[in-house]
Structure formats: structure tokens, C-alpha cells
Amino acid sequence: MDTEYVRSRFIKHFDGTTGFLYASPGRINLIGEHTDYNGGFVFPGAVDKGMIAEIKPNGTDKVKAYSIDLKDYVEFGLNEEDAPRASWARYIFGVCREMIKRGVDVKGFNTAFAGDVPLGAGMSSSAELESTDRKSTRLNSSHSQQSRMPSSA
């Protein structure tokens, strides 16, 4: 995955400045799919494909997200109850809502992201998006002297 390409799309779709770059690897589960969240055993391994996101606080209570691969833009408020219509944006929404529920003072941010893990191939592309979003939101919160999510979460 090319960080410069992600950065160029971020600059184009947002205010012309840069933010923080975050990466998350794809993974495979060698003993079967969907066992991890159904109480089964897992034997995961990272792969050489993954996701890169550029994220920057925007000083609002809104998340503005651009999926480079899907060429799709979504904006939602952090206090909204209803998830966005775009299925990919629901992962970002869910992570933000859960962090807020756990006491993290999540602030609005702009993000553009892309990945080279095939969608729907059982390589956890949705988990990449969630972990990249959680990691970046948590780090942005700690950079801003805000409360942190417990490490056991």
C-alpha cells in the first residue's frame, strides 16, 4: 500500500493539509472463518496486505470519511444515534460510539483510507478499518490530553 497515494487523496479531499498516517495489517485465520467472535478457537496470522489511513482532527463533532477504494464520502455527527447508510462507514461509526460509551472524549476528524486486502475474501478488511480507526482515534485523543480508553478494551 502506498502511503503517498493515501496522503495525496487526503490532501485533495480535505483542507489541503496533512494529518497522521496509521496502518493496520490484514490477517487470515488458519483454522476457519468467523470463529473468533463466535467463541471458537483462532490461529491468526498477519499478511503482507493491509490498510493505511490518514487522519486529522477537524475541530468539530463530525467525522468526515473518504474511502479511496470505493470513491465514497460519508459525514456523520459523533452524537448521532443512527449509523450512516454506507456499510463501510458503519464500522467507523461503531468504533466511535463504543469509545464514547467507554468514556473517551472522541473529537471530530477527517480521514481518507485505502487498502489492498480483497473485500469479502475472509482476510478481515472490516477489522482492519476498525483497528486503524480505533488506534488513530485513541492516539489523537491522547495527543490532545483527552481521556484514554482502558488498555483492556
Q: How would you describe each model-predicted region?
A:
Residues 135, 139-153:
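Single conserved hydrophobic/aromatic residue that forms the stacking wall/gate
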